[in-house]
Curated annotation (Swiss-Prot):
Task performed by this protein: May act as a bridging protein that binds pectin and other cell wall polysaccharides. Probably involved in maintaining esterification of pectins. May be involved in the specific O-acetylation of cell wall polymers.
Protein name (record): Protein trichome birefringence-like 12
Protein localization: Membrane
Keywords tagged on the record: Membrane, Signal-anchor, Transmembrane, Transmembrane helix
Family: Belongs to the PC-esterase family. TBL subfamily.
Motif (GDS motif): 130-132
Main localisation: membrane
Pfam families noted in UniProt: PC-Esterase, PMR5N
The species this protein was found in: Arabidopsis thaliana
Gene that encodes it: TBL12
Length: 407
């Protein structure tokens, strides 16, 4: 039909009919293509390019940076132990000691955020069990965490040697002193017996009985950090006062030397931990902290008056047992621990290597008491606070929070 010069179609022209019939097909095809590509993109892409290895916080190097942020605490922290409070004791070079920053290979290590950490740990508890190096570790931890809760109070319940309660977060962090982990006690001998062979008495070690200080408290903690090592030497238990090992209440025959005795104690303590400590508890074993005595042991005028960290190529000379140096025991002890823990779920806290460098960071002669060095010698075993244990805390906090996120 035509109106004037305009043509009006009462039916759709063939060209329009054909194009309109194609439109749904095009839309359908487009949707199918989008679906296809979305599925392709969701599939993992295989490649022969190796993915980067997981971050190893324990391998790296110390980097000096005068702009490194100052420690989170100072000499006024109420949880200090006097001999390690190197700021109060006016130790030389404390600014320099704390200007070195640990940089792991291939990744970064963030300084602990005390508020975030305690917030994540709300209503949870952290326990340290072992010798005074775990106490050294704990004191650093307490002073750092107190930044987030200045109302923290000292806590010595449940046979804890030292600790703190953080009421703002309902968190307890404490240390239980158990230097051998196993139960041990002094057994004196009569004067007549001592005169015969020179042995004044013995220390009985029950290899299968945990020390009273921690045997019944592990269920209280959500995180536990164990260690033992520094007492397993002849400087602590010389031939005049040796260790004698017992099992099931009876002396072990033939008698064991110190390191085989340590190995047997370790086997029994690890077995107890796996059997008795709740499976949900996050368990760490801190490897040995190295000593840095130079020129003799602690009781032989050994010294550590160094002003910078060791170089990488010096470490084996100081610590490799094959060189029979003064400080060889750490790696020997560590190998025994690694062998025993390799089939367990206890996580290794390998702080040894990073600490081996830091010969410059011990209290040395700055012990806070006038006659301390004359009586005890230099302290080249424990660490100045603030100092290297603050880096241990950074690493431990990172590992704890990582494990909490994956629960």
């Amino acid at each position: 039909m035509e109106l004037g010069s305009r043509r009006i179609y009462t039916t759709m022209p063939s060209k329009l009919r054909s194009s309109s019939s194609l439109l749904p097909r095009i839309l359908l095809l487009s949707l199918l293509l989008l679906l296809f590509y979305s599925l392709i993109l969701r599939r993992p892409i295989t490649s022969n390019i190796a993915s980067p290895p997981p971050c190893d916080l324990f391998s790296g190097r110390w980097v000096f940076n005068p702009e490194t942020p100052k420690p989170l605490y100072d000499e006024t922290c109420p949880f200090h132990r006097n001999a390690w409070n190197c700021l109060r004791n006016k130790r030389d070079n404390m600014d320099v000691i704390n200007s070195w920053r640990w940089e792991p290979n291939g990744c970064g290590l963030s300084r602990i955020d005390p508020t975030r950490f305690l917030g994540m740990m709300r209503n949870k508890n952290v326990g340290f069990v072992g010798d005074s190096l775990n106490e050294n570790f704990l004191v650093s931890f307490l002073c750092i965490l107190r930044v987030a809760d200045p109302s923290a109070i000292k806590w010595k319940k449940k046979k804890a040697w030292r600790g703190a309660y953080f009421p703002k977060f309902n968190v307890t962090v404490a240390y239980h002193r158990a230097v051998l982990l196993a139960k041990y006690q002094w057994q004196a001998r009569s004067s007549a017996e001592a005169n015969q062979d020179g042995v004044k008495g013995t220390y009985r070690v029950d290899v299968d009985v945990p020390a009273n200080e921690w045997i019944n408290v592990t269920s209280f903690y959500d995180v536990l950090i164990f260690n033992s090592g520094h007492w397993w030497g002849y400087d602590k238990f010389p031939k005049e006062t040796p260790l004698v090992f017992y099992r099931k209440g009876k002396p072990i025959n033939p008698p064991l030397d110190i390191l085989p005795g340590f190995e047997l104690v370790l086997q029994n303590m690890v077995s107890y931990i796996q059997r008795e400590v709740p499976a949900k508890t996050l368990k760490f074993w801190r490897l040995q902290s190295p000593r840095h005595f130079y020129g003799g042991d602690w009781n032989q005028n050994g010294s550590c008056l160094l002003d910078k960290p060791l170089e990488e190529n010096q470490l084996d000379l100081w610590f490799d047992p094959r060189n029979n140096g003064v400080n060889k025991e750490a790696r020997k002890i560590n190998q025994i621990i690694k062998n025993e823990l390799q089939t367990t779920k206890i996580k290794l806290l390998d702080l040894t290597h990073l600490s081996e460098f830091r010969a410059d960071a011990h209290p040395a002669i700055w012990l806070g008491k006038q006659d301390a060095v004359a009586i005890w010698g230099q302290d080249c075993m424990h660490w100045c606070l603030p100092g290297v244990p603050d880096t241990w805390v950074d690493i431990l906090a990172e590992l704890i929070l990582t494990n909490l996120k994956t629960e």
